Amino acid sequence: MSGIIHKIEETLHVGGHKKEEHKGEHHGEHKGEHKGEHHGEHKGEHKGEQHHGEHKEGLVDKIKDKIHGDGHDKGEKKKKKDKKKKEHGHDHHGHSSSSDSD
């Protein structure tokens, strides 16, 4: 999961890469050491580590800003191409349809 987030950060040029790399090193080193040893003791300690969820929320907001372009255009928004609306009038220019055969 963190690998996917890291690739998104690289693509969108979001800062904080050193912090993420540092976190990844610690998770990789300690996974094998504590596997199955102290599951009961650590349950209460991990509840306080919800700051990581806040970081994800900030990351998602940054991604949404990149997609929608909020704040980066400085008032210059890209205008969508106006589609030409077909005028349905009495001028058919020789075209007929099945509904015209009354």
Curated annotation (Swiss-Prot):
Query: Which residues lie in Basic and acidic residues bias regions?
Result: 1-76
Question: What does it do?
Answer: Intrinsically disordered and metal-binding protein that may play a role in stress responses.
Coiled coil regions, renumbered to chain: none
Species the sequence originates in: Glycine max (Soybean)
Instruction: Name the protein family.
Output: Belongs to the KS-type dehydrin family.
- The region called 9 X approximate tandem repeats is annotated at 21-58
Q: Outline the segment boundaries, as ranges, of region: Disordered.
A: 1-102
Intervals holding sequence repeats: 21-24, 25-28, 29-32, 33-36, 37-40, 41-44, 45-48, 49-53, 54-58
The GO molecular function terms of this record are: metal ion binding
**So which domain of life are we looking at?**
Eukaryota
Q: State the conditions that upregulate or repress this gene.
A: By cold stress. Induced by heat shock, drought, wounding and infection by soybean mosaic virus (SMV).
Q: Where is the composition biased (Basic residues)?
A: 77-95
UniProt keyword annotations, A-Z: Metal-binding, Repeat, Stress response
Q: What is this protein called?
A: Protein SRC1
